[in-house]
Structure formats: C-alpha cells, structure tokens
Amino acid sequence: MRPSERLLNRLWAHEKASYGLRVFIALSTWMALCWYRDDLQPLPSLFLGTIASAIAETDDNGWGRSKSVLLSLLCFAAAAASVVQLFAWPLPFAAALAVAAFALTLLGALGERYASIGQATVTLAIYTMIAMDQHHDTAIAWREVAQMLAGAAWYGALSILWTLLFANRPVRERLARLFAELGRYLQLKADLFEPVRHEDLRARRLALAEQNVRVVEALDVTKAAILSRFGRSGRPGVQSGLYFRLYYMAQDFHERASSSHYPYEALAEAFFHSDVLYRCRRLLSLQGLACMALGQAIRLRHGFDHGERNRQAGQDLEQSLQYLRQQHNPHWRRLLGSLQLLAANLSGIARQLSEASLADSPLDGIDTRLRDSSPHTLREMGARLRRALTPGSLLFRHGLRIALALIAGYALLRLAHPDNGYWVLLTIMVVCRPSFGATRLRLVQRVAGTLLGLGAAWALMQLFPDTTLHLLLALAAALLFFVTRNERYLVATAAITLMALLCFNLLGDGYVMIWPRLLDTLIGGAIATAASLLILPDWEGRRLHQVMAQVIATSTRYLDEVLGQYRNGMRDDLPYRIARRDMHNADVALSVALANMLREPQYARGNLDAGFRFLALSNTLLGYLSALGAHRAQAALDEDSLVSQGQHCVQQALTGLAAALEARHPAPPADAAEAMLADALEQLPEDIGDKSRLVRTQLALILHLLPGLRAAADAAVATARPAPAVASAA
C-alpha cells in the first residue's frame, strides 16, 4: 500500500472521521446549494438546523435511528412553533420556556437518546428566539423555522442512510478505543511494580484510578453499541460473534489487570535485589502496548500479531521465578506464591492476546447475554419518569435549576433589552451542568473559548474579506466544533463562535456582534453559576457517604458471587458479570465524585483527604477481590473451616460498614477476632491447594484492610453534612 493510501486509510478509520464526514456532507450540501442559487440568506438557519440535529444524534441501529430522527423533528417543530406563537407575550412565553426546559431535561431519565433530543430541542428553540429577536417579523421567522427544520431533516436522513451503510462501524470504533484505554491502564499498572524505595505510590495509584474511570466508561459505551446492534437476547450471529468475543476478552483483561495479589510495598522490599519485579513490569508494559496494537488492528481491520517480545518476556519472568524458588528461602514462601499467581494472571492475558486473531471462533457454552438497563415499554418509561419526579432526584434538581436560570435570563432581557441578548439563554443552557464542579469547569471553558473564537473571527474578517473564504472558514469551524465538542470543549466553543460570526457577517456586519456575544456569554455564565450555587445545590461532599456506601455494598455482592463460583465451578455468566460491573461502576462513581469536590467551594467540600484515602483503600479492596475473580475455579472450600469463617467475617464487616456509611453513622468497632482470624488464614499448610491458598491469602489481606477503611469512612462521615435522599433517575 502506498503512503498516500495508508494515510487515507488511517484518516478514514479515525474515530471522529465518520461523524465529521457526515457533518461535512450535510453542511457543504447547503453551502453549495445557496452558492448555486446566489442566495446566502438561508445559510445560517440551515446550518443551525443541521447543528441541532447533529447534537440530537446518538449511536443506534437503523430502526432506532429512524425513530430518533422522527421524534427529534417533531420536538423541533413543536418547540419552534411555540416560540413564534408566544414570543410577543412575555408571561406565557416565560412560563412555557420554564416548563419546556424542565420537562425536556427530565427526558434524560429515559436514557441518552432522549437526553440528547431534549438538549437539542431547547437549543433549536433558542435559535428560533434569536431569529425572532433579529427580524421582529412573524413571516420571516416562520421562513427561518422552515429552513432550520429542513437542515435538521437533511442531516437526519443522512444519518439514517449512514447507519444502514456502515452498521457495525461504531462497534469497531468503540472496541478499538476500549483496547487502547486498556493498554494505557496496563502500562500505568506496570509502574506499580518498579521496585524503588520511598516512591510516591499514592500518586501512581490515583493516576491508575483516573485511567480506570476511562476504561469503565469505554466498557459501558461498547456494551451500549453492541446492544443497539445485536440486542440483548444473547444469541449473536456469525458476524457479531467476533465483537462479543472481543468485548468479553476486554472484560477479562480488565479484571486481571485490576487484581492485586499482595501489597506492592512488601513485594518491593522482599525482592529489592532481584529482577523479578522488573520482569513483571516489562511484561505488563509490553502487554499494554499489545492491547493498543490490537485496538489499532480492530480500527484499521488489519491482522494482529501478539509479538515475539511478549512471548520472550513471559519466558524470562518464568525463569526468574524458577530461580527464586530454587533458593528455598522460607521468608519468601508466601510472597512467591503471590508472585506465581501474578505470573499466571499475566500468562492468561498473553494467551488471549495470542488467540485474538482467532476471535471469530464459535461462542458455544458462553453466556452472551448483556444487561440492558434502557426502558423499552411505556410502563418502564413511566416508572423512570415517576422516580425522576421527586426533589431528591439529581435530574429533577438539575431541571429545576435550568428552568429558573432561563427565567432569570429572560427577565433580564426584558428589563435591559440588550442587542442579540438571547445568546444569554444559550449560554445558560450549555454552561449549567448537574454539579457545581462541572458547571464551574464548563464556565471557564465557555468564556475562554468565546474569547478565542471572537479574536480569531475579528482577525480573519480583517485579513480575509472575501465571502467565499468566509464560507469555507465557517464550514471548517463547524466541522471542528463537532469533532472536539465532547473531549475539548474550549476548542469547540471557539470553533462555534467563529462559525456564528462568519455566518452573520455574510448577512451584515459581523463586527457588531463581537461585544454583544462576549457580554452575553459573561452574563449567561454568571446566571448559570449562581443557579448551581444557590438553587438546591448538589454538593458532592454532602452525599459522599452514600457513594462510599455503594462501593462497599457492591464489593460485598461481588465477593459473594465470586466465592460461589469457587464452590460451584467457574461460570462467566450474566449474574457474575453484573456483580463485577456494578463494583467497578461504583468505584468510578467515587472517583468522579471526588474530582467534582475539588472544584466545589471550600465550605462544601468536607474531608477531601479522607475521601481520597478511602478511594485508595477501596481500590486496593477491588484489587484483592479481582484477584479472586481472575483465578476462580472450583475448589474444596467447604472442607476448610477457616475459609468459611473468613468469608462470613469479611461479609459481615463490609455489610456493617456499608450500612453505617449509608446512615452517616460511625463505622462498627473492629472485632478483635478479625486480626486473629487474619493471622490464622495466613498460616498455610504445606499440602494446601493453590486455589485454597489464594482464597485464604486474599481474605486475610481484606481483613487487614478493614481498619483503614473504617478509619477513612469515619473521617469522611464526621465532616459530611446531611444530604437529601437521592433517587435514581436512570
């Protein structure tokens, strides 16, 4: 393949290429049509309609996408017509604006599809307000509404056609991203095995926890893509079998990579003068690179080779372990057992990587069902909406904040009558987020992006007055907005600001829009921030104990599930995968909550240090439990009374801690028998089986971890303030 063809292939395979090309085709079609007719007047409205339709787009199959497009167009038409009819009546208009914003925000309880449609509908309604404000002529407003709906319909039709032509491409893209994130996770995990004394392991563990958030998000997005294409029946066909196997392989990699077989500090101290930990680190790092290469192979649809370096690194590790065993050091006996399990874990990853090219083999005997939490009937949808219609629901409070903030913004417009003031409402809509931390971050990005976009627009209009060039620049800016709007919002804001000014400059003097746009952004951002700060604020610190309780509760359920498989035999079935995914999702929720707390006012944060200590300890707990899951196989656990006692003691302690956290009570006092039981579990007989040895060791490690978990939980609860009960909105 020639270099130019290789470059085009890589560009086409890029995750954003499909989305960007759809937007480019839709916008360039309208641009060419308006240019051909020598009439640029409809272009801004056509662009805005296309943008609203693209914002409403979510990943789905052909039938689902068709339903989404039809629902979007109906919502767009109803919203735009309501704006035109009520615009001259301030009080009914304000009431309708608040009710519509609240109701459309509450649609998010039904899932991502409805949340996107709701956000896009409010956005198009504000676009219609801007049109009414500029022309004050109902006939012109109806014409621009029709143009916006035409732009939305054209993009919707293109989106449906694209889904039919490239039905499985989104699944490949998400699998490729998943393996890339897993590769980065493995490389960060490898850094923990560097046997360097006095190293800041806490910073490395926090970096690993942040990457774990990305891995879990990638797993959830990939599962949603598979569900939308192949359903939840668990009967994949020949073509979809490849995607199912790769997804389950990624889940297994994540469990193996998350596992911890012994405290890293103890391993580093014991084997400081050996190369065994460097061998572990090298193999894990190479496996991370192999995962990234597998993701690239999935994206480019190329073959994948595990690589000779990985095989050699595995052999080197085994030889290093063999040398240590030959030393017959009694102090290393237990640690060498943990290292042997670690080597077996890495060997499992290596084996599956070497078989990745055979991933289209039959899925006989594998439970391929997936949990689908989306509502599919009117009864399920009604139940979701009823749960969201309570003051304790985060979505209810967010919708109320947006509604009241929009009323405040509209009242300010009626009192001050600023030029082009409806951009204030648009800023409120995009800046106001469910949490104060997210709102604060979005405000900074919006203001900085607006300043950058206004500066770029002024410079480009000064340097290049040619209309044709303005059209091309507006098209490029719109494309940049969609490519960056989810990952780099500051750049996306600059791009959409540039596009807006260039489009309005085609119809008049774009320079007069610069200062009003900046002023409206500042006013809207201030109102959105005040709403997040004053109207039923959702401080993460006030409900941190609930998030921590969920972490402990899901860990307890997972422990029960995994030990059941040691007694009854390994089954990678749906209940086990649900318990594992719930545990990881709870861990991610704690990481996200603590990250949001860092952006909250000092008085609302609570004890951040205790929260991060608890996060580090809960990640360690997750690692110990994942090690049990990674090596699960049937073993005679019922014959070992200490294992039964250890399981009962751990489950009782974790259940009590979860209940105390949920109620914001101090953790139950430690039982003196816990330490004695942990010591007894660590006394391993010579003839004990490998699986029983593992279960004993992991239960003992968890028992040793309990005092630290209780202390961190008590410190967090002692400084937390009461929070209202939170109802699930999804």
What are the residue ranges of the model-derived segments?
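Alpha-helical transmembrane segments and their membrane-interface boundaries
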Residues: 1-166, 170, 333, 337, ...
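Long, hydrophobic alpha-helical segments that serve as membrane-spanning/inserting helices
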Residues: 1-24, 28, 32, 36, ...
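Residues on a specific face of well-ordered alpha-helices
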Residues: 101, 105, 152-156, 180, ...
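C-terminal functional regions that serve as terminal interaction/effector modules
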Residues: 467, 475, 483, 490-498, ...
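Membrane-helix cytosolic exit motif
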Residues: 527-540, 544, 560-567
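Catalytic-loop region of hydrolases
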Residues: 615
